[in-house]
Amino acid sequence: MAHKKGGGSTKNGRDSNPKYLGVKAAGVSTVNAGTIILRQRGTAIKPGDNAGLGKDHTIFALVDGTVHFRNGRNNKKQVDIIPS
């Protein structure tokens, strides 16, 4: 006979790493070309003028300028870079 009970198991004890999503450069902030403006899953916010879209749906600046968020077609949010 065992003098200690069995260890048992649990289905808890895991957690995923944080993904650090969200806005990285707020509206009316100055950015350089290549600066990440927004990290997201899917295209909740679309790139507008002078903004590019990465393969993981990251929006980044194509030119030096100022970040400007606006409502585009069908009330979808867009991010523009106004060149400085």
Swiss-Prot record:
Q: Name one GO cellular component term.
A: ribonucleoprotein complex
Q: Does the keyword Iron-sulfur apply?
A: no
The protein's name: Large ribosomal subunit protein bL27
Q: Which organism is it from?
A: Prosthecochloris vibrioformis (Chlorobium vibrioforme)
Tell whether Cell cycle is among the UniProt keywords: no
Which UniProt keywords are present, listed alphabetically? Answer: Ribonucleoprotein, Ribosomal protein
Q: Which NCBIfam families match?
A: L27 (TIGR00062)
Could you tell me which SUPFAM superfamilies the record lists for this protein? Ribosomal L27 protein-like
